[in-house]
């Protein structure tokens, strides 16, 4: 099976009985999860719960040991899938920006368009400039990553991902490496994407963002889904003791965040 634009267009995600181990250490223990087109799903939970591993399995940056992942009509876990083609329909934003330091901002946002999508340089630059303007970086296309703040670099990473016209965006703790005063500018961009109907899976410790923006919150611990549901329900009125304990520590300023 190979991915095609039409089969990916639904941008839904179906994860069934997903298992992932590193040696004898089980990181994911039978995860089931659904993301509908246009939904924002936030994954929350303590460090070591498997959130980032689950996210990285969606585009096979990590290969699961068992289970299935469907993105649209494409089974990502099919051994015959053209994963590189599938990935062209998914954008991913990492904690550490992962920009090319030797390229200016414009080139960072055009290189994949040209090499992967086959766009002309002129077309790629037009798309990149549009996306850079969208994230508030108009006029900074000639600068290099080292000349930007952390928040600006992360916004470049988002613009770079959006320049590929993805059907699905994956965010792996996109604000965790930022100074506190820079977090808001990145979350604002993500709010705008949600308002535009982008399908998003977000690993985050930003509970206010999750409660405000997420259609669904999934609380994970020890490699399993402990609780999931609408954000107001899971964050505002959690039913499971493990979720209650985690949120009490995260939301109570007198306690250290579990991270």
What residue ranges belong to the model's regions?
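C-terminal boundary and immediately downstream tail of ABC-type ATPase nucleotide-binding domains
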Residues: 2, 221, 232-259
């Amino acid at each position: 099976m190979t991915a095609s634009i039409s089969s990916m267009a639904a941008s839904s995600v179906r994860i069934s009985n997903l298992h992932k181990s590193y040696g004898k250490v089980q990181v994911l223990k039978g995860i089931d999860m659904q993301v509908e087109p246009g939904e924002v799903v936030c994954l929350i939970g303590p460090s070591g719960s498997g959130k980032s591993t689950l996210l990285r399995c969606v585009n096979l940056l990590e290969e699961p040991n068992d289970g299935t992942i469907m993105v649209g009509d494409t089974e990502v876990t099919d051994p015959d899938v053209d994963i590189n083609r599938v990935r062209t329909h998914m954008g991913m934003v990492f904690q550490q920006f992962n920009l090319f330091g030797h390229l200016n901002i414009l080139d960072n946002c055009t290189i994949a368009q040209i090499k992967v999508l086959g766009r002309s340089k002129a077309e790629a630059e037009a798309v990149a400039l549009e996306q850079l303007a969208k994230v508030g970086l108009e006029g900074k296309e000639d600068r290099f990553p080292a000349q930007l703040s952390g928040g600006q670099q992360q916004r470049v990473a988002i613009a770079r991902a959006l320049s590929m016209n993805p059907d699905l965006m994956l965010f792996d703790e996109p604000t965790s490496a930022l100074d506190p005063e820079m977090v808001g500018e990145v979350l604002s961009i993500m709010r705008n994407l949600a308002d535009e109907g982008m399908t998003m899976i977000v690993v985050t410790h930003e509970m206010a963002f999750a409660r405000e923006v997420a259609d669904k919150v999934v609380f994970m611990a020890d490699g399993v889904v402990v609780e999931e549901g609408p954000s107001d329900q899971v964050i505002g009125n959690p039913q499971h003791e493990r979720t209650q304990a985690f949120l009490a520590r995260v939301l109570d300023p007198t306690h250290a965040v579990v991270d």
